[in-house]
Amino acid sequence: MKTKTVRILTCSWVAFVASSMAGESAGIGADEALSRLLNGDKRFAAGKSEEPHDAALIERRHTLAKEQKPFAVILSCSDSRVPPELVFDVSLGDIFVVRTAGEVVDEVVLGSIEYAIEHLGTHLIVVLAHQRCGAVSAAVSGATDTGDIPDVLKAILPAVEETKGQAGDPIDNAVRANARDIAKRLQSSSSIIAPRVQSGEVKIVAAYYSLDTGQIELLK
């Protein structure tokens, strides 16, 4: 009987934790969302990630099955070394992630981000660039390719031109400039996002992830 009671209490606690965490993501403002992401990255970089696993994660999956309320949109590179959910130490349902090579934005990508803002009530967009981005490296080196890859490189070229002659590493300079440029374009090219940014309802930030340290830097 005692063992059975312990199991019931344990399951109840797991359900409570998962339900509470799902609710925490809903309706938080941009500044609080950004703080939560940066604190998560600090834990990740220090090897102290704390998001739920096993039973709590399973229960959270059930809780989120019918509705999602992500607290941030992350537009990041497709690079396998930069998974946003791990980098920000978040769990199921916390962030709405859109990934493309070099964070390149087209109509489909923009529509995906607009969906999160318009229909999911998300107030923060993070454009997440990263150290040693292969797409930016190819654009800087003037690489040519086949298929649709040249379209990706073409989209990054403005950042390459913008940073030519600057001191420092040309690839790193272009990576940072590309993220800043994309953040600006997201605001100016979307009739859904622009008025919300102007009113202060939505915030867009550019950020840079270091592969060497695991740390994220906000870009000015």
Give the location of each predicted region.
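Bacterial N-terminal signal peptides that target proteins for export
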Residues: 1-10
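Conserved functional hotspot residues or short segments at active or partner-binding sites
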Residues: 127
